[in-house]
Structure formats: C-alpha cells, structure tokens
C-alpha cells in the first residue's frame, strides 16, 4: 500500500453495500451489489471468527428522501422484486429500502489485514510503486519509488480509481459505480 493499509479512502468509505440509486444504473451494478452483500455477510462472520475483529455487517436499510422519481423507482423495484416501504420523514413521505446492508469500513480493513497476515500473506505498507512499464499480463517483480525491487509470484492491485498512477494506459478508463 502507498500508505498504511485501510487508512485512506477505505477508511472514509460509508460502507453502504448497495448503489445509492440503483434505478439509474445498469442492472449489472445492482446484481453485483446484491451478491456482494451476501458475500460480506458470510465473510464478516469468517473474519470475526479468525481475527476477533467484528466488521459489524448490519442490514440497517436505506432511506430515500424527496425529491425522487417514484415511477422510475417502482418500475425498478417491480422488475427486481425489491421491497420498498413508505415512511414518514419530516412531515413528508420517504422511501425505505429495508434490505440494504452496511459494514464498518475501518473495522473491515483492520480485520482483513489481520486475516491476511494470519494466512501468511506479506503486506507491504508505506511503499509507492513505479508505473508498470511492460505490457505483460503477469509480472513477478515491481520497482518502488525508492528504487527497491519487490519480487513475488503474484501482485494484487487494489488501487481502484488510482490504478492509472501505476498503469497509465488505464487513465480515463476506470469509473466509480
């Protein structure tokens, strides 16, 4: 990690395991999030069992407050067989999506780090990597900004939107969902 693992965007993330307005996204985004929530539920249990750190997975629901396009939302909910409830919010009607789950991102990252170390995986923190120069799909060494060469059987890049900093050809090709 360029800095300490789990101390940047993953630390600040809200941990909502659902697209904020699924009715405006392609169905693949909703499908991914729906499956991810179930994965996180089970993964959280496993992390807690192995590490003693509870990532606090919880189905808290999500409230949608006006203004919103009720026709579009109802069409999406009907298509996906998703339950939506009307609730009162400051003397107006809001919508509650009761099945939406969340997780505490800082606790999740702390548990994942401990779990990976427990599995014998080496995590290198506070190390900035140089951009990848070759076009190989698989690399087994990587140069750091302070000119150290890291060798490994595999590298897992988890830089998200910052991937262009280490693989410039992906500039303008990575988008948040």
Predicted regions and their residues:
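Glycine-rich nucleotide phosphate-binding loop and flanking beta-alpha elements
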Residues: 71, 130-131, 162-164
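A conserved short coil-to-beta-strand element within the FAD-binding core of flavoproteins
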Residues: 122-141
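Dinucleotide-binding Rossmann-like beta1-alpha1 core, especially the glycine-rich loop
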Residues: 15-93
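Glycine-rich FAD pyrophosphate-binding loop
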Residues: 1-13
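Short glycine-/acidic-enriched loop or helix-start segments at secondary-structure transitions
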Residues: 9, 29, 134, 166-168
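Central helical "cap/lid" subdomain
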Residues: 6, 148-177
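Short beta-strand to alpha-helix junction loop
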Residues: 31-34, 67-70, 95-114
